[in-house]
Amino acid sequence: SRYRIRLIMKSKRLQGLVTAGRWTLPAAIFICTLCWVLTSALLPELTMTAGEEGGSVLWQSARTLLLPAWAEHLVSFLIYAAIGYFLIELNNRFSIIRMRASVQTAIYFLLVTVCPEMHLLYAGNVAAITFLFSIYFLFKSYQQSQASGYLFYSFLFIGAGSILFPQLTFFSVLWLFEAHRFQSLTFRSFCGALIGWTMPYWMLFGHAFFYDQMELFYHPFKELATFGDIFNLQILQPWELATLGYLLVLFIVSAAHCVVAGFEDKIRTRAYLQFLIDVTLFLFVLIVLQPSQCSNLLPLLMISNSILIGHLFVLTNNKTSNIFFIVATVCLILLFGFNVWTLL
């Protein structure tokens, strides 16, 4: 039949072999681990640029006092591994790519690997985990008449992450808008969301008040109100500009595919994909507004972008998409070489 012929043709293309192959994720893990070790050897003195540490006083103190310098790469690697696992679970639970795919995790690992400076431990790394958990509970609230509990947990993780990375609070506004689109925002669920977001801060307030360290409580709000150099993209490093350009091109193509081919997905899936498009666009805007936080926002940007890119490559099967897949892969390799070269 015609459908069977299309499947055979797709299986012969590189794109089909990679996206449908059972060894894609193990191969990506092996390649990423190897590149991670090689970049650690090539860049043994790699440190964060001044002003890019980000995070709250609590995060900076914990990072300095509790974690030796040699363990940064290992802890960061384990955090990214956890994010990759939860990306698989997120797709399996909500069927965003219409199949039990792990290609989004392979893409996420590769995107992180080609940016050696992201191998360091940023507040954004930990915030990315809470960000992903928050998305999970927000997705579960879709068209739920009793969504208070789901929004409570979703905003609880936003609040917990914002204690370490205050800029995560900005997403609470977008989350409320998306909850309204998911038809799960009522007065009761709004109160649940508000209680969830404030709960980590009540706990922080109790600790700060008891130990007379109120600066710990005030600092996240001060950091949130400090924007730094708005629109000053000149402070971005070459590797950050190159990575953002690469991600922007893939996002535009992936988002266009979601819009054009959205009729092939269920209504619920289209809502999830639109959410991911909104979040990715929001992250790009936030990076433009606060370029000093780029390194902390990139792990979050790669989460939403990797799902959209995976959706594009898994569900397209024509010659044009295969050529684009090959070009994107070659550009990813070149990006890795460029990023390493600029840091030598």
Where are these regions (language model features)?
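Juxtamembrane membrane-water interface segments that cap and precede transmembrane helices
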Residues: 52-67, 218-241, 256-257
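Membrane-embedded glycan-lipid processing machinery
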Residues: 71, 75, 114-126, 293-297, ...
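Transmembrane-helix motifs of polytopic, lipid-linked glycan transferases
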Residues: 78-94
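Membrane-embedded helix bundles of polyisoprenyl
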Residues: 101-116, 125-133, 154
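Membrane-interface transmembrane helices that cradle and orient dolichyl/undecaprenyl
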Residues: 134-149
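Membrane-water interface signatures at transmembrane helix termini and the short loops
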Residues: 256-317
